Amino acid sequence: GLAVQHVKSQLASDPQAEAAIESLGKYAKQARHCLAIGDSKKLGLLMNRSQTILSKLGVSHPTLDLFANLSLSNGALGAKLTGGGMGGCLISLTPDKPSAEKIATVLEKHGAIHTWIEPLVTLNRKGDHHDHS
């Protein structure tokens, strides 16, 4: 897609882009571990770091950046784009359902078309699902 093409062109012209991509990979592995052990605070931090990199790589969108900042300023532990990039969808990690509801309302007031609230589900080392709602 468009985001992949954009990143490929940056990799060819910007030596720091490769390090940024490597950081995203490292954060993804750490995020998986956070999900496995239920460390939502560190997961949120990793989401924020990833969003900063994605924005610098130019695959975010100003509206998604705004929504991420609004999420964080209204209680989210982390927020980052998801999907193919270049706009569209944001995930905000909140400590509880009331925080999620507050953030959904704020985002809708700022133009979000749809919001969904889903509990965080993680896997333990045996592969059993755990609902953290």
Predicted features and spans:
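Glycine-rich active-site/cofactor-binding loop and its immediate structural neighborhood
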Residues: 87
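C-terminal nucleotide
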Residues: 1-79, 91-133
